[in-house]
Amino acid sequence: MRLLASVLLALFAVSHAEEGARLLASKSLLNRYAVEGRDLTLQYNIYNVGSSAALDVELSDDSFPPEDFGIVSGMLNVKWDRIAPASNVSHTVVLRPLKAGYFNFTSATVTYLAQEDGPVVIGFTSAPGQGGILAQREFDRRFSPHFLDWAAFGVMTLPSIGIPLLLWYSSKRKYDTPKSKKN
């Protein structure tokens, strides 16, 4: 009985020790393939799992240099006045990769106040990791329907199928002609 009481007291103390806002942040790529010259969609999700509102929340992502990525829509630096407890916010950015190759998608920085007069808390989002950005030509070669290739294949296989068919048909016609009956 004493053990149960001490465990409950410890859990109660831990739950009251972590009062204030606590943010969990994730960064994810929504595209299956990153392709040079095509839109790349990033989504940031921030969850407040704490007991009070997070104040002056700022999301900053400096991992996309302007010489490698163009911003199509959205912003890489965003501010929210407050995020209520047990709620979340999402932010989406659409980028356009300008160069093909491997790129390390690192985490973004999240800063906020856990309590009104408390210190600034610095956190990081999850990092998608290293990924390849395909060249437009390579992407088209891999994933296009190849209609022209299939048409050329069909034209090239016609002689190998058509010549034996014509020989068979002429032989069949020669030997299958009904003979006229003599009376």
Curated annotation (Swiss-Prot):
It holds the Pfam family TRAP_beta. The chain crosses the membrane at residues 150-169. It is found in: Endoplasmic reticulum membrane. Residues 170-183 are cytoplasmic. Glycans are attached at N88, N104. One of its GO terms (cellular component) is endoplasmic reticulum membrane. Keywords: Endoplasmic reticulum, Glycoprotein, Membrane, Signal, Transmembrane, Transmembrane helix. The keyword Membrane applies. Residues 18-149 are lumenal. One of its GO terms (biological process) is in utero embryonic development. It is a single-pass type I membrane protein. TRAP proteins are part of a complex whose function is to bind calcium to the ER membrane and thereby regulate the retention of ER resident proteins. Belongs to the TRAP-beta family. Heterotetramer of TRAP-alpha, TRAP-beta, TRAP-delta and TRAP-gamma. Interacts with STING1. PANTHER family: TRANSLOCON-ASSOCIATED PROTEIN SUBUNIT BETA (PTHR12861:SF3), TRANSLOCON-ASSOCIATED PROTEIN, BETA SUBUNIT PRECURSOR TRAP-BETA SIGNAL SEQUENCE RECEPTOR BETA SUBUNIT (PTHR12861). This is Translocon-associated protein subunit beta. It comes from Canis lupus familiaris.
